[in-house]
Regions:
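Metalloprotease/metallohydrolase-associated module, dominated by Zn2+-dependent proteases
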Residues: 5-50, 56-58, 63, 67-86, ...
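Short alpha-helix carrying the canonical HExxH Zn2+-binding catalytic motif
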Residues: 97-113
């Protein structure tokens, strides 16, 4: 086990602060979903899709705290290849991918998961799943991938 994962309970307040700050930034600076994307978000299980904002960015936001940054890197959460990341109702998507339907639906599934579990519940479950199963096999990631494919291919 890596040290940052073992320190997650102590780091959680800082992680929550970071997630809340990034969500606020996305809500302040992002754009609302189009009517078609609102329909997709509803199909993905989002109860309040009108609250979602999407921010196109050159790169996905990184945590400022070194141990949180290390944990995110070790779990594969934020890599140079990361296309998008959801912070509550805020979705950050790399510039050029913000109109990619499958990516947005995938992230909307994560919004629905945040709605269901709350920020702390989402983060704890998500990180534990990735630690135990790896990023690609984490149940929350599989759910998002499968739902995105199903919705896009309807």
């Amino acid at each position: 086990m890596n040290l940052p994962f073992l320190e997650l309970p102590q780091l959680l307040p800082r992680v929550l602060d970071w997630v809340e700050a990034e969500q606020k930034r996305a809500l302040d600076q992002g754009t609302a979903l189009s009517p078609a994307a609102l329909d997709d978000a509803r199909a993905a299980g989002v109860r309040m899709p009108e609250s979602i904002r999407v921010c196109a960015v050159p790169e996905i936001p990184q945590p400022g705290h070194p141990k949180i940054k290390q944990l995110a890197a070790e779990l594969g959460l934020i890599t140079p290849q990361t296309i998008a990341m959801t912070f509550g109702f805020g979705i950050f998507v790399r510039t050029g991918r913000a109109s990619d339907r499958e990516t947005l639906v995938h992230e909307c599934v994560h919004v629905a998961q945040y709605e269901e579990l709350g920020v702390e519940g989402f983060l704890m479950q998500y990180v534990v799943q990735i630690f135990k199963n790896g990023y690609d096999n984490a149940p929350m990631e599989r759910e998002a991938r499968e739902a995105a494919l199903r919705i896009v291919n309807q």
